[in-house]
């Protein structure tokens, strides 16, 4: 086996569909509703592991988990007019109960700012109760009219983590935005997923937000995918829903809010970014199975049984040390067939144990990411596997960051930017004066989408690619999902 990444990069869509199906992560396209898939047991365990990282980081920073109803009345959803305009073409509506028409249409939750603010209005009365941080992990529904894609563009987003916070002042809410950004950085670092962090321009903010900050990553085909967003909502939703609190000075005022979300796309990025032509390479931090033991049969039945017994013993040693391990005891498949199966599942480490290892009380270790191998004594296997898992995690992270950085280009000419994007460059940064008019023109001329501009100050000694005035920053442009 050699490491190749041709199919992974040049035919990514086919590669991704193949991995989800053959790796038994997610069955998509066969459930009889467009844009909805089924999490299979192996993929569901990966999903659980990723959710666990998210949940632990939120819980440890004072967030409290809640669970809201799926249905939102139309009159409530429309209370924040900018918000509903941003979603009205994407809402699924329930219009009947049994055979009777409903008096008020009910929306399948597209997001929960309005619903949660409604209840916060009942629960929170004073600055003494603030800050308040809620979150839930639920399904949301969007009536996508574009071509749907498994995990990437869905009508039911099954893993939507949405956090909603309430604060006395604008500055308090801004500090929460900064905390949320740091939480997301930790999440993506745990997943070994690289990103660029941008502030979305005014014409592409979340509906009803004052500011939107987005995490984007570059997929194998050069297209960019949004993997997380953080929104400073100001008083827009509290004002629309007449939600007031008593402030420290005794006055009543609308509190300031934030919201931030992560979806199935984070899981898609974990599967996609660390892959090769043989399948995904799951980071050990979230891999459902960290080690697979593949017994190599002996020339006789008795020898094969002894190899199997030794293989099971090694696997039990690892499991007792909290290293998730399985032994592939399928007698109908050859070792080569088993290698194929576990490679497409992205298991980080394979142990091969045959008569030679049995006779010498050793174990043969094979890394999935770079194919390096080691032979270690039985008593050393636990420590060596732990060491190798840590190395794989760090190497995947480094490789992914290096790849992302290599796919960010700078162009001070609009034609150059367009050509780079047409050749799957990834992200192109162009000098920009800061005006909406020029930003929209950049989108039009490059036939791409503006991601936003860096949140840190970026001095640009150049001219805007459109108006030729002095540039204030760079604008990031990409082909996107």
UniProtKB/Swiss-Prot annotation:
SUPFAM superfamilies per the record? C-terminal domain of ProRS, Class II aaRS ABD-related, Class II aaRS and biotin synthetases
Pfam annotation, one family: HGTP_anticodon
Coiled coil segments of this chain: none
Which terms does the UniProt entry file under GO BP? Answer: prolyl-tRNA aminoacylation
Q: Which GO terms describe its cellular component?
A: aminoacyl-tRNA synthetase multienzyme complex; cytoplasm
**Mostly located where?**
cytoplasm
Q: What is its EC number?
A: 6.1.1.15
Judged by the first EC level, this protein's enzyme class is: ligase
Q: Which SMART domains match?
A: ProRS-C_1 (SM00946)
Catalyzes what? tRNA(Pro) + L-proline + ATP = L-prolyl-tRNA(Pro) + AMP + diphosphate
Its subcellular locations are:
Cytoplasm
InterPro entries, A to Z: aa-tRNA-synt_IIb, aa-tRNA-synth_II, aa-tRNA-synth_II/BPL/LPL, Anticodon-bd, Anticodon-bd_dom_sf, Pro-tRNA-ligase_IIa, Pro-tRNA-ligase_IIa_arc-type, Pro-tRNA_ligase_II_C
What PROSITE patterns does the record point to?
Answer: AA_TRNA_LIGASE_II (PS50862)
Gene Ontology MF, one = ATP binding
Q: Supply the alphabetized keyword list.
A: Aminoacyl-tRNA synthetase, ATP-binding, Cytoplasm, Ligase, Nucleotide-binding, Protein biosynthesis
Q: Note the PANTHER family from the entry.
A: BIFUNCTIONAL GLUTAMATE_PROLINE--TRNA LIGASE, PROLYL-TRNA SYNTHETASE
Assembly behavior? Homodimer.
Domains (record comment): Consists of three domains: the N-terminal catalytic domain, the anticodon-binding domain and the C-terminal extension.
Biological role: Catalyzes the attachment of proline to tRNA(Pro) in a two-step reaction: proline is first activated by ATP to form Pro-AMP and then transferred to the acceptor end of tRNA(Pro).
Homology family? Belongs to the class-II aminoacyl-tRNA synthetase family. ProS type 3 subfamily.
**Full protein name:** Proline--tRNA ligase
Q: Which organism is it from?
A: Saccharolobus islandicus (strain M.14.25 / Kamchatka #1)
Q: Its encoding gene is what?
A: proS
């Amino acid at each position: 086996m050699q490491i190749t990444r041709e199919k992974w990069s040049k035919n990514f869509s086919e590669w991704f569909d193949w991995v989800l199906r053959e790796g038994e992560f997610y069955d998509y396209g066969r459930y009889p509703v467009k844009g909805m898939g089924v999490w299979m047991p192996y993929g569901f365990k990966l999903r659980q592991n990723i959710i666990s990282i998210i949940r632990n980081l939120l819980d440890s920073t004072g967030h409290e988990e809640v669970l809201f109803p799926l249905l939102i009345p139309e009159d409530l959803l429309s209370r924040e007019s900018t918000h509903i305009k941003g979603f009205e073409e994407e809402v699924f509506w329930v219009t009947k109960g049994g055979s009777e028409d409903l008096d008020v249409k009910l929306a399948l939750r597209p997001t929960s700012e309005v619903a949660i603010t409604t209840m916060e209005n009942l629960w929170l009365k004073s600055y003494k109760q603030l800050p308040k941080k809620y979150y839930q992990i639920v399904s949301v529904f969007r009536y996508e009219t574009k071509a749907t894609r498994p995990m990437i563009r869905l009508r039911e987003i099954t893993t939507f983590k949405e956090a909603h916070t309430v604060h006395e002042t604008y500055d308090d809410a801004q500090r929460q935005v900064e905390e949320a950004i740091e939480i997301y950085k930790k999440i993506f670092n745990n997943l070994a997923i690289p990103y660029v962090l941008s502030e979305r321009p005014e014409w592409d903010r979340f509906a009803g937000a004052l500011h939107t900050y987005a995490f984007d990553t570059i997929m194998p085909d050069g297209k960019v995918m949004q993997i997380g967003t953080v929104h400073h909502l100001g008083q827009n939703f509290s004002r629309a829903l007449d939600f007031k609190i008593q402030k420290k000075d005794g006055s009543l005022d609308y509190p300031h809010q934030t919201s931030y979300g992560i979806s199935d796309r984070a899981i898609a990025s974990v599967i996609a970014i660390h892959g090769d032509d043989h399948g995904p390479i799951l980071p050990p931090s979230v891999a459902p199975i960290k080690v697979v033991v593949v017994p190599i049969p002996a020339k006789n039945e008795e020898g094969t049984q002894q190899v199997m017994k030794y293989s099971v013993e090694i696997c039990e040693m690892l499991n007792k040390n909290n290293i998730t391990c399985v032994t592939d005891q399928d007698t109908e498949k050859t070792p080569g067939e088993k290698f194929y199966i576990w490679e497409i599942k992205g298991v980080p480490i394979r142990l091969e144990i045959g008569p030679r290892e049995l006779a010498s009380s050793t174990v043969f270790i094979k890394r999935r990411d770079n194919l390096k191998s080691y032979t270690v004594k039985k008593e050393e296997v636990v420590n060596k596997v732990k060491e190798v898992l840590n190395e794989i995690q760090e190497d995947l992270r480094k490789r992914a960051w290096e790849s992302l950085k290599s796919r960010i280009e700078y162009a001070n000419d609009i034609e150059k930017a367009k050509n780079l994007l047409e050749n799957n460059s990834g992200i192109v940064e162009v000098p920009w004066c800061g005006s909406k008019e020029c930003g929209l023109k950049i989108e039009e001329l490059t036939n791409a989408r503006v991601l936003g501009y860096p949140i840190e100050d970026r001095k640009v000694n150049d001219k805007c690619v459109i108006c030729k005035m002095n540039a204030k920053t760079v604008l990031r442009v990409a082909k996107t999902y």
